[in-house]
Amino acid sequence: SAGPASLLSWILAGAILGVLALVHAELGSTYPLSGGTARFPFLGFGALGGFTGGWMAWIQAVTIAPIEVEAALTYLESTSLHPGFVHSNGTLTGSGIAVAGVCMAVFTYINIMGVRWLAESNNIAMIWKLAVPTLTIIVLLIVTFNGSNFSANSGGGFAPFGAKGIFAALPLGVVFALEGFEQAIQVGGESKNPQHDIHRAVIISMLIGTAIYLLLEVAFIGALNPKDIGHGWTNPIPGQGSFGPYASLATTAGVGWLATILYIDAVISPAGTGLVYAGTSSRLSYSLSRNGYWPPRLGQVDKRGVPFASLIFCWVIGMLVFLPFPSWAGMVGLVTAATVLMYAMAPPSLAALRRSDPDRPRPYRLPAAWFLAPLSFVCANFIVYWAGWNTIFWLYIFIIAGFVVFFVYQAVAPAGRKLALHWKAASWIPPWLIGLGIISYLGQFPTSKPSSGWPFGIALLAKQDIPFWVDLGVVAVFSLVIYYWAARVAMPTEYVKQAVEVVDEEANLAALTQEHEAAPVA
């Protein structure tokens, strides 16, 4: 959607996620708690704020494994084997869904076997995932590089779709590729030296990821045949190249051995990511249960310390994700928006906790937080807005479903698990989500129907009542109002100090949350 200007999309995404990563780095090193992305809003905004952050984190975690499985099957379909797992429109066939279920079951089984199996499997996959992209960059830059592709006038120039194309590319795959820095936060409570390790892991992972993907994009654009982009950038690789673009380019360049490695990588890399997130989603289910948000059965572990019920539950939900969102492209937009909403909870949490817990040692402090924290919140809302009304609508269906389950459970939960919700501290959350949805509905994204992969064939277009560029100003002003609102209604100091101890020890949160009410911080 951006042409050669996609390089700017990668730089912009790296900068935005980089600042968000720095926000998480301070929070993670200051509050090294397992499942940190769900815990920070709990500390800053009470039980309802904690559920909101935890639910968004769970949505993105439980959908990533299915996305990675479908990506692997889609790549496999583009090989000479043609196993019949994917329809021509990108959706899975019946046999494809069956194979996807087996893959998800394997991820679940490895996680059930415990941390040692998971760590060994993930270490191997991680080495592979770094080596193959690096090799691809080097080979393509040496073997085939057409510098004219970066300014091909016949294809519309450097930015054939203008600024709108650059922005729209972020939620279509760019941000999705760079996500994942929060994994160091999720396991922060298990690090040997969290105050020293967490912020370094977050920052280094973002720098390496951004550099690799930016160079991959340079190699990709440079390897394209100038004749194929003469008609435009809509389909720069004719035929089935869109299913395995780098492998197709390697084949065309005469390096078939690299294409073979890339097809193997198309299975190993998604499998490694899916394996990690199968465990992450179960960890978050466990955390939501331990926090009193979900039934206690999901918060139980077996003799190996594995949350067996949560793993099975997440496998079932992962399979359901294939049904309404069968297309890889359709799922990427959804999970990107969910992930960025999860990230967006961090800047207000940082502001709230700096005000209500100012004396706590902070091994890493975000520089110029007065500027970077609100800026990161604005930029996170930009990415969600660029995902488009179609994506936001379906994401909000998931969010509403989660709140319905939460409130129903709270209504029937035994007295010992009922939570004081701290409505005042979380008062900014409903206006934030509703307002962002309204702006998206009236805004500029999307302006054309996606080709496939949306639930039940429904594609919802934005009304475009707010002009382009004006819409970004509206999002920015709205975001700043919400940010400073959130900072003013933080939970009081006494609550935060006790909550850190209770969360760290996984004690009875219901007892804690009944004791405090939100109070504005002077």
What are these regions (language model features)?
Residues 1-91, 95, 99, 208, ...:
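Extracellular loop-to-transmembrane helix junctions
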Residues 33, 56-71, 178, 183-191, ...:
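Membrane-helix boundary/coupling elements in multi-pass transport proteins
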Residues 39-41, 46, 77-87, 201-275, ...:
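TM-loop-TM module centered on a large, flexible mid-protein loop between adjacent transmembrane helices
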Residues 47, 62, 94-101, 192-196, ...:
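Loop-to-transmembrane helix boundary motifs in multi-pass membrane proteins
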Residues 79, 111, 127-157, 217-226, ...:
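Hydrophobic alpha-helical segments and their helix-loop junctions in multi-pass secondary transporters
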Residues 95-149, 202-206, 335-344, 395-402:
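Membrane-interface loop-to-helix entry segments
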